[in-house]
């Protein structure tokens, strides 16, 4: 077992207090906490349940409630995180209740859904939470029975003393435990003793989801609630000049039409807000249909922004042709040097063979199935907001600053989200809802249509990369050069593989400014790097006459045994481990004859994933028969959820690589709904996905995003085998609806 110190201060892991009617309550400062569940039918609720932010409650009947500060976005933290607490508490899973906590930054240090952080950053705190409660219950029993605490054991929510034969349920000792001082040290279980962690548990919201129970932001309703929508400029690079709402206000059910300003000239308040528009027009009415119709009757005049605009973005109306030209020009010049090993110029000069390729990817829209929406009820001295957001803590600050209210007077409640993928990290719609409610002096739900969301959203940046490799006369890789950039940011990870495995290495970055709003998109940067890098490495392996898996393994062996440089931010052994496993599980060496197979491996968010994609040609069209996935994400808390996330990432990655792309004409997206923006269809998904996890005792690492990037590279390499052509530009199939 592991002995750990508890930390007791204002933002400490654990606080203790007594519950009304008896019970033990522990509150935590979890970096990325627990989840919510329905009450098990076997469990009778205690008489005096009450809730506080970030706590574990034990009722006098043995029931356990764990509050979840983290937003639930489909990553299954509402199931997996309480499993960690329950295991260390040593309670039967059927006695666990979990509820969504309200936002409270006085208790929680981080309330965020993003960066694949929930389990990996919450792991230790969650374990300590359960272990501390268990220790206090053991101490209470030892005091009651007048025996040493080391003689008290637990199992499934029951305390035992073998010597006397005494036993008691947790509920019987909860009140006594609440009177004890929190221990300075607690014992954590040995990994081999886990009984809940590592077992598959169903999604606690599963029944509610499939039966249509109100869980999501669009489900949220309250008495007297009005509906609002936004009229945006017809293009990025424009601003409001004037508007005439006479006809719109005369429409049935319309309450008001007015301009709103949400921009704040403070980066700390504004970082999670869109920064492309400073003033918008709000339409408010009784129903969505009435507001949509009134919106069509608005007469709005817009004008171009000037070079000295408040937003600090370039003026002008941008088009895809201009974007591509600017990126190509930037890529043709030396960039900002981010890493240099050896003498890459000399290596390329003396190379027997040089391979050079260019890769590009367009802007992409997130397109979660639930469009942006948020509820706000703003009073003179208090604001209640509720809805789907990945960053409630940061948006609380933005809303408070914009409304001029103290932070403690803003209450943000989190609903389940119908998808996010990074889109809901940016809360402009939340600020807009608050400003509209303040103006109306009434509860309001702001709703974006699909066209609103796609036309005025936050996009995955456009990217462009130049890769070069130098081979000597013996086909050894002696030089590697990557020059990578984008609009408006570079996705370059200069210290990741193959850095550290090549003697002569150069990584450069560049950027092109834009007035189009961009931001995080599932596995930021990596969602382009993986397909470009892994496609290029496949070509280099082919040019060297080497098996693509063995070629990568040879490089990783060098990085592991004799690394170049000291700033390599990946574990070469874990990287090689997923490649070895996927080679074995896919039968790469024994079962590849006659198959069109592609392989790729990638590292991000502290996890490692390798894929093999099998493609068949049917009537001249590629059909994805099977995808193999090998995943090293450390200890797998909930295998069923882990498989689901991996499978979903694979389907999502294939769809975006094949079909998804957003182009612009004079500042406006050419694709504004699913009739123009292609997503993967059921018949195009892999017929079979086989997922394997590397077993180890490493603390959990990320999983919501790591399985997404590599499958795109494996797909590109499999398509090459099937079609005989390389795929350098995404989407591989243009926006076709044939």
Task: Kindly label every feature range from the protein language model.
Residues 2-27, 39-738:
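Cofactor-binding beta-sheet edge motifs in enzyme active sites
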């Amino acid at each position: 077992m592991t002995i750990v110190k508890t930390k007791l201060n204002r933002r400490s892991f654990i606080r203790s207090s007594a519950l009304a009617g008896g019970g033990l309550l522990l509150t935590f400062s979890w970096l990325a906490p627990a989840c919510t569940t329905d009450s098990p039918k076997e469990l009778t609720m205690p008489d005096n349940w009450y809730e506080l932010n970030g706590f574990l409650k034990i009722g006098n009947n043995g029931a356990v409630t764990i509050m979840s500060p983290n937003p639930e976005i489909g990553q299954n933290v509402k199931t997996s995180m309480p499993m960690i607490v329950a295991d260390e508490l040593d309670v039967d899973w059927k006695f666990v209740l979990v509820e969504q906590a309200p936002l409270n930054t006085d208790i929680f240090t981080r309330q965020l859904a993003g960066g694949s952080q929930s389990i990996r950053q919450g792991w230790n705190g969650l374990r300590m939470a359960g272990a501390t409660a268990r220790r206090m219950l053991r101490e209470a029993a030892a005091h009651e029975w007048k025996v040493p605490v080391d003689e008290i054991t637990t199992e499934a929510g029951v305390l035992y003393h073998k010597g006397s034969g005494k036993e008691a349920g947790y509920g019987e000792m909860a009140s006594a435990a609440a009177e004890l001082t929190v221990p300075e040290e607690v014992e954590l279980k040995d990994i081999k003793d886990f009984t809940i962690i590592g077992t598959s548990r169903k999604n606690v919201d599963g029944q509610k989801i499939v039966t249509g129970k109100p869980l999501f932001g669009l489900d949220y309703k309250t008495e007297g609630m009005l509906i609002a929508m936004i009229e945006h400029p017809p293009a990025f690079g424009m601003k409001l000049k004037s508007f005439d709402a006479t006809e719109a206000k005369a429409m049935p059910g319309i309450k008001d039409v007015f301009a709103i300003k949400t921009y704040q000239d403070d980066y700390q308040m504004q970082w999670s807000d869109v920064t492309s528009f400073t003033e918008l027009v709000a339409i408010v009415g009784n129903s969505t249909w009435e507001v949509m119709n009134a919106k069509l009757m608005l007469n709005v005049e817009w004008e171009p922004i000037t070079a000295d605009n408040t937003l600090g973005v370039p003026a002008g109306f941008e088009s895809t042709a201009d974007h591509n030209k600017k990126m190509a020009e930037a890529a043709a010049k030396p960039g900002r040097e981010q890493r240099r090993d050896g003498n890459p110029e000399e290596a390329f000069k003396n190379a027997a063979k040089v391979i050079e390729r260019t890769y590009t990817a367009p802007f992409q829209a997130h397109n979660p199935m639930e469009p942006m929406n948020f509820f706000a009820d703003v009073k003179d001295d208090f604001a209640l907001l509720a809805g789907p957001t990945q960053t409630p803590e940061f948006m609380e600050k933005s809303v408070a600053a914009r409304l001029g209210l103290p932070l403690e007077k803003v209450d943000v409640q989190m609903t389940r989200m119908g998808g996010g993928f990074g889109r809901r990290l940016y809360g402009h719609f939340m600020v807009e809802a608050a400003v509209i409610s303040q103006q109306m002096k009434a509860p309001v739900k702001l709703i974006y249509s699909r066209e609103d969301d796609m036309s005025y959203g936050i996009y995955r940046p456009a990217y462009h990369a130049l890769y070069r490799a130098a081979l000597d006369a013996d086909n050894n890789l002696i030089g590697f050069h990557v020059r990578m950039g984008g609009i408006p940011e570079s996705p370059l990870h200069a210290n990741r593989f193959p850095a550290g495995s090549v003697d002569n290495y150069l990584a450069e970055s560049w950027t092109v400014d834009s007035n189009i709003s961009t931001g995080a998109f599932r596995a930021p940067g990596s969602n382009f790097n993986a397909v470009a890098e892994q496609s290029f490495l496949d070509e280099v392996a082919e040019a060297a006459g080497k098996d693509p898996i063995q070629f990568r393994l040879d490089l990783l062996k060098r990085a592991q045994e004799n690394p170049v440089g000291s700033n390599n931010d990946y574990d070469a052994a874990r990287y090689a481990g997923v490649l070895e496993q996927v080679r074995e599980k896919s039968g790469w060496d024994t079962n590849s004859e006659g198959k069109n197979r592609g392989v790729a491996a990638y590292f991000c968010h502290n996890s490692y994933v390798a894929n093999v994609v099998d493609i068949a040609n049917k009537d001249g069209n590629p059909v994805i028969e099977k995808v193999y996935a090998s995943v090293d994400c450390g200890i797998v808390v909930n295998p069923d959820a882990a498989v689901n996330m991996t499978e979903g990432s694979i389907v999502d990655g294939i769809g975006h690589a094949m079909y998804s792309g957003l182009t612009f004409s004079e500042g406006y997206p050419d694709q504004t709904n699913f009739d123009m923006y292609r997503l993967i269809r059921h018949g195009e998904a892999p017929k079979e996905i086989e997922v394997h996890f590397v077993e180890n005792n490493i603390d959990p690492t990320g999983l919501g995003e790591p399985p997404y990037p590599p499958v795109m590279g494996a797909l590109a390499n499999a398509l090459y085998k099937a079609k005989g052509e390389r795929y350098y530009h995404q989407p591989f199939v243009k926006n076709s609806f044939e």
